[in-house]
């Protein structure tokens, strides 16, 4: 049986080798017939910590890796605009006031 594949957006990359991916699907309401957007979060394994918040990624089903992780990041479909630019911070820690 082939493994399931989903495409979603990275919501969080704060954990080591783990990302939270939001996958949106459209489901039809049984009585009304209207399509409703449903979003589900998946914890996915990111071996090299390559994913950043806002990236569009493809995740694939895998064996259980922890209590919550059952998916692996297969590839990064599209990089986020914000992920490409790393913020340059003042490493000296001083303020700009020279009194």
UniProtKB/Swiss-Prot annotation:
Keyword Ribonucleoprotein carried by entry: yes
Alphabetized CDD domains for the sequence: Ribosomal_uS17 (cd00364)
Cited InterPro entries: NA-bd_OB-fold (IPR012340), Ribosomal_uS17 (IPR000266), Ribosomal_uS17_bact/chlr (IPR019984), Ribosomal_uS17_CS (IPR019979)
GO cellular component: cytosolic small ribosomal subunit
Keyword annotations of the record: Ribonucleoprotein, Ribosomal protein, RNA-binding, rRNA-binding
Signal peptide: none
GO-annotated molecular function: rRNA binding; structural constituent of ribosome
Pfam families: Ribosomal_S17
GO biological process: translation
Keyword Translocase on entry: no
Role of this protein: One of the primary rRNA binding proteins, it binds specifically to the 5'-end of 16S ribosomal RNA.
Assembly behavior: Part of the 30S ribosomal subunit.
Family: Belongs to the universal ribosomal protein uS17 family.
UniProt protein name: Small ribosomal subunit protein uS17
Biological classification of the source: Bacteria, Thermotogati, Thermotogota, Thermotogae, Thermotogales
């Amino acid at each position: 049986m082939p493994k399931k594949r989903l495409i979603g957006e990275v919501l969080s990359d704060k954990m080591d080798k783990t990302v939270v991916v939001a996958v949106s699907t459209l489901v039809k309401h049984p009585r009304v017939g209207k399509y409703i957007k449903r979003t589900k979060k998946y914890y996915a394994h990111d071996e090299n910590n390559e994913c950043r918040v806002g990236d569009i990624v493809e995740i694939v089903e895998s064996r259980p890796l922890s209590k919550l992780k059952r998916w692996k990041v297969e590839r990064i479909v599209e990089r986020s605009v914000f992920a490409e630019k790393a913020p340059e911070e003042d490493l000296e820690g001083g303020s700009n006031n020279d009194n």
